[in-house]
Amino acid sequence: MDKKPLNTLISATGLWMSRTGKLHKIRHHEVSKRKIYIEMECGERLVVNNSRSCRAARALRHHKYRKICKHCRVSDEDLNKFLTRTNEDKSNAKVTVVSAPKIRKVMPKSVARTPKPLENTAPVQTLPSESQPAPTTPISASTTAPASTSTTAPAPASTTAPAPASTTAPASASTTISTSAMPASTSAQGTTKFNYISGGFPRPIPVQASAPALTKSQIDRLQGLLSPKDEISLDSGTPFRKLESELLSRRRKDLKQIYAEEREHYLGKLEREITKFFVDRGFLEIKSPILIPMEYIERMGIDNDKELSKQIFRVDNNFCLRPMLAPNLYNYLRKLNRALPDPIKIFEIGPCYRKESDGKEHLEEFTMLNFCQMGSGCTRENLEAIIKDFLDYLGIDFEIVGDSCMVYGDTLDVMHGDLELSSAVVGPVPMDRDWGINKPWIGAGFGLERLLKVMHNFKNIKRASRSESYYNGISTNL
């Protein structure tokens, strides 16, 4: 019978026993993956491990205590419930009936005795096929039977008669049997081949087996080593070790070439290219904090959406890791509006964090580009023109489709096939007044890892991310 974990015992009794045997009434408790947070009626708080075999679990399971806490007000009903030993429901017990093994009768040695082979007599070999040849006619030392005159009579499959001593030629140095007269035979199933050795007995010829099918872990390993430029099929029947060795050799060569020539990380190189593009077009580069107040998240309206709220990496009750760049850019637009001429154009490239589902298109740590313009010229036509110039600069095909989201309302999605590259907005939007913005604006956000995935034809977005497992899409697990 399995022992109940500590959280089950606490939920069943509502009581806690201290190390000194004092019984407490539990006011509230919360269970995490490994810990239990307990608050007593007397105000005492503690954190314990959720275990089956800890001291507290054993004490609650044995229903014994020394005294009751005076401030916890343990009722008689709770006490009686704790003292009553409730066994597990026996109706749920599974009973497995195991039959005793049958005892085989051992044949007496007098019945199971095998005849002793005669001296100077070759043992009889039975072929594995159902039709087996009769004993071969003995050949003397002075004569050799030609292959054309030898005859073979099939023997019954159920009986095998031992060769009599009178029909077996004695073994001597002058006795020879021609092996060329014995053709290779095949078993009834046609899978095992035999060749005949001296004495007319079959010897199996090994048949080379095909390479076994690749397991899922082997396929995952090979796919991690594959590069988009590799033309290697995993269904070719090539053994795993041979495929792995070939791919490892190629990846080491690729890393050596990068180290000798380029020495630039794809993500860092793309950041520098994007920075040059926007700086040359009059945009001001921004670097804002990664740790932001939870108040910014509430102002963006994320706390009202349950799914988006679950994606926030909270540091404590007051701060979190930024899930987007927009809050800080809002603040910069409001402050720079007091000093800079119209229009104000800014952009930022930096890491963001969300508890995204693990997949080929999502990362929990990713790099965002946000650009925005506030004031004159903030039209949809100008926004689409900036997006077109930017993606043409990177050499990426795209199309723009209409969409909507909870934060901004109506948006423009920039798509590359089925992959969303960006979400763009033409302001103003209702939340602008919460940030002190009262002018029209346009803006868009791009995920740099998705841009790299398209540019280098990566099948998995992790190859383009901040990772210790990949460098420029090349596996480092070599």
From Swiss-Prot:
Cellular component (GO) terms are:
cytoplasm
- Region feature Disordered, mapped onto this chain: 106-188
Location of this chain's protein in the cell? Cytoplasm
Q: Does the keyword Aminoacyl-tRNA synthetase apply?
A: yes
Q: Which SUPFAM superfamilies match?
A: Class II aaRS and biotin synthetases
UniProt lists compositionally biased (Polar residues) regions at: 122-132
Which InterPro entries does the entry link to? aa-tRNA-synth_II, aa-tRNA-synth_II/BPL/LPL, Phenylalanyl-tRNA_Synthase, Pyrrolysyl-tRNA_ligase, Pyrrolysyl-tRNA_ligase_C, Pyrrolysyl-tRNA_ligase_N
Judged by the first EC level, this protein's enzyme class is ligase
Compositional bias per record (Low complexity), positions renumbered to this chain: 133-188
In alphabetical order, the GO MF annotations are:
ATP binding; pyrrolysyl-tRNA synthetase activity; tRNA binding
Alphabetical keyword list:
Aminoacyl-tRNA synthetase, ATP-binding, Cytoplasm, Ligase, Nucleotide-binding, Protein biosynthesis
- Name one process (GO BP) from the record: tRNA aminoacylation for protein translation
Instruction: List the catalytic activities from the record.
Output: tRNA(Pyl) + L-pyrrolysine + ATP = L-pyrrolysyl-tRNA(Pyl) + AMP + diphosphate
User: What does this chain do?
Assistant: Catalyzes the attachment of pyrrolysine to tRNA(Pyl). Pyrrolysine is a lysine derivative encoded by the termination codon UAG.
Recorded family membership: Belongs to the class-II aminoacyl-tRNA synthetase family.
Q: What is this protein's record name?
A: Pyrrolysine--tRNA ligase
